[in-house]
Amino acid sequence: MSFKKVSFAAVAAVCLFLGGCTQPRTTQIELPKSALDSVNLPNEVAIAGEKFILKQKNARTAEYYLPNEKVGFKWTKLVSITVDENADINEYQRTFMTALKSGQFGKAEYDFKSINDKEYQAYTIYYPIAGNPDFDNYEINLIHVKSLNCGLRVTHYALKFLNIADRSKFHALIKQKMPIFLAQMPQVECK
């Protein structure tokens, strides 16, 4: 018998013995509930005349990409919806602002504007990070955060610009796009 066959047989026997694979189990493993299960998510979103398709989601965040763009960092425009069942809106804002001020996400400009005690709007302008191919462009995020009965809903509309873009035009663009985003963002509500 070859060494590979003997090694495999020994490893398999140890796994069966130590893993208890020889006896059937009746224990059910229940996966954690997704925060997104508590809201009605659309499959498509339209903002500024462009259609975004739900292409990726995890337990807390759904990402919508343009039809011809792939999941990952090479998108040009992106819509995302995050639901956090346990977040406090004020603590969320403080934590986000602290991270921005610290430079955790690289150099950034930002502004937060309270709408009322249950919602606010914000924008971020992230600067390119030299040498990082995933973050080598400017990125503008228009953000709306609202406290719902089922958790905190955070909606982002993100736009990327080449690292040679004229930064002086970003604030005018934000002023133009923010009302469109707020009027057309998906109205995701609790189930």
Model-derived features with residue positions:
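Secretory pathway targeting signatures of secreted, lumenal, and periplasmic proteins
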Residues: 48-88
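Signature of long, low-cysteine stretches enriched in small and polar/charged residues
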Residues: 104-146
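Short, solvent-exposed recognition patches
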Residues: 82-108
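Short secondary-structure junctions
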Residues: 44-57, 100-115
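Bacterial N-terminal signal peptides that target proteins for export
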Residues: 1-10
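Surface-exposed amphipathic alpha-helical segments
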Residues: 151-191
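N-terminal "mature-domain start" segment
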Residues: 25-64
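C-terminal motif of bacterial Sec signal peptides marking the signal peptidase cleavage site
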Residues: 18-20
